[in-house]
Swiss-Prot record:
GO terms for cellular component: extracellular space. Changing residue 24 to K: Important increase in potency toward Nav1.7/SCN9A, and low potency on Nav1.4/SCN4A and Nav1.5/SCN5A; synthetic variant D1Z/M5I/K18Y/R24Ka. Synthetic variant D1Z/M5I/K18Y/R24Ka has a N-terminal pyroglutamate and a C-terminal amidation. It shows an IC(50)=2.7 nM on Nav1.7/SCN9A and IC(50)>3 uM on Nav1.4/SCN4A and Nav1.5/SCN5A. Disulfide bonds join 2-17, 9-22, 16-29. The presence of a 'disulfide through disulfide knot' structurally defines this protein as a knottin. Signal peptide: none annotated. Belongs to the neurotoxin 10 (Hwtx-1) family. 04 (CcoTx1) subfamily. It is found in: Secreted. The keyword Isomerase does not apply. Pfam families: Toxin_12. GO terms for molecular function: calcium channel regulator activity; sodium channel inhibitor activity; toxin activity. This is Beta-theraphotoxin-Cm1a. The modification Leucine amide is found at residue 33.
Length: 33
């Protein structure tokens, strides 16, 4: 199961969905342009 938009995440263990990335600053999944 992956994390979607605006879900809180850990930058060291990025479990965001495909095309998303865990923001180190905000600590939630953002769309990776």
């Amino acid at each position: 199961d992956c994390l979607g938009w605006f879900k809180s995440c850990d930058p060291k263990n990025d479990k965001c969905c495909k095309n998303y990335t865990c923001s180190r600053r905000d600590r939630w999944c953002k769309y990776d342009l």
